[in-house]
Amino acid sequence: ADLNLVKDDAGATVVPGNNLTYTLAVANAGPSDAAALSVTDTIPAGLGFVSATGAGWACGQAAGVVTCTRPTLAVGAAPAITLVVSVPANYAGANPILNSATVGSSTADPTPGDNTDGESTPVGAGSADLAIVKDDGGASVVPGNNVTYALDVTNLGPSDASTVSVTDAVPAGLGFVSATGAGWTCGEAAGVVTCTRATLAVGPAPSISVVFSVPASYTG
C-alpha cells in the first residue's frame, strides 16, 4: 500500500493569540488496502493543542504528540484530518513555525519517502486592541477639593501589548496631585499625565487613579 501525506496550512500567516489550522490529507495509491494506519504530528515548541478531527479517524494528544488512527484505508483518499493548534498571545518562539506529519501502517509501503510532509508558517506581528474607560464615579466636585478619575485599560487581544502608554491632559485651571496604578509608572510634565507599562497581557490592567486639585478660586 503506497501511502502519502500532504500537510497544508492554506498559506496562512498566524498572529500570536490566534489558532493555526492544518489539513492533513492521506491517500493510498495501492495496490493493496492499508491496515492499522497511524498519523503522527509533534506540536511545535511553544504552541498548544486545541483539537484533531477527521471522519473515521480516532485522534488524541499525549506529551505534545498528536496521533490519529484508523483500522483500514482502501485504495484512494481518506477523509482529511483537521489539526488545530494555539499560538499564545505572548509567543516568542521560532518564526516561521515548522511542523511536519507522518503516516504509516502495518502494510508494507514500496515508496515511504512521501509519507512525511511539512509546512512553514510565518508568524505575523502581534495585534492588540486596546480600550480605555475614564470614570469620575459620578462625582460633583467643590472648588477647593480634589477630583479623582479611574482610568481602566483593557487589552482585547488577540496578542499581548508592549510599551503601553496612557496620557491624560490636566484640565485648564486644575493642578496635578497624583497618578498611581499597580504595574504602571506614572508622572506629569507640562500639564500632561503619562503612565506606562512594559507589557499588557490580554485582559484588564490594574486601574490607574489620577487625582487633580480644583482650586478654591476655580471659575473654569
Name the predicted role of every residue range:
Residues 1-220:
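Exported/extracytosolic protein signature
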